[in-house]
Amino acid sequence: MHTTRLKRVGGSVMLTVPPALLNALSLGTDNEVGMVIDNGRLIVEPYRRPQYSLAELLAQCDPNAEISAEEREWLDAPATGQEEI
């Protein structure tokens, strides 16, 4: 088990993570992690944003849904750049 000490940095408390643990989780600075308390334990784990395929995203859409006034305005607006429609 690795141990570390909580340190005050400005108005926050910092938890330093030993390099061996970062390497084991393929983490580095500026990576996002999730934190949760479970039975009195702080659990920190890598946060990976879900990756969806186009098919998965389209499966969530209702092709019969009504178009809102805002969407209709956007669809009817003239091209403003080099769009090809």
UniProtKB/Swiss-Prot annotation:
Keywords: DNA-binding, Plasmid, Toxin-antitoxin system. InterPro entries: Antitox_PemI-like, SpoVT-AbrB_dom, SpoVT-AbrB_sf. One of its GO terms (molecular function) is DNA binding. Residues 4-49 form the SpoVT-AbrB domain. It holds the Pfam family MazE_antitoxin. Forms a complex with cognate toxin PemK. Antitoxin component of a type II toxin-antitoxin (TA) system. Labile antitoxin that binds to its cognate PemK endoribonuclease toxin and neutralizes its activity. Responsible for the stable maintenance of the plasmid during cell division. Both PemI and PemK proteins bind to the promoter region of the pem operon to autoregulate their synthesis. Belongs to the PemI family. This is Antitoxin PemI. It comes from Escherichia coli.
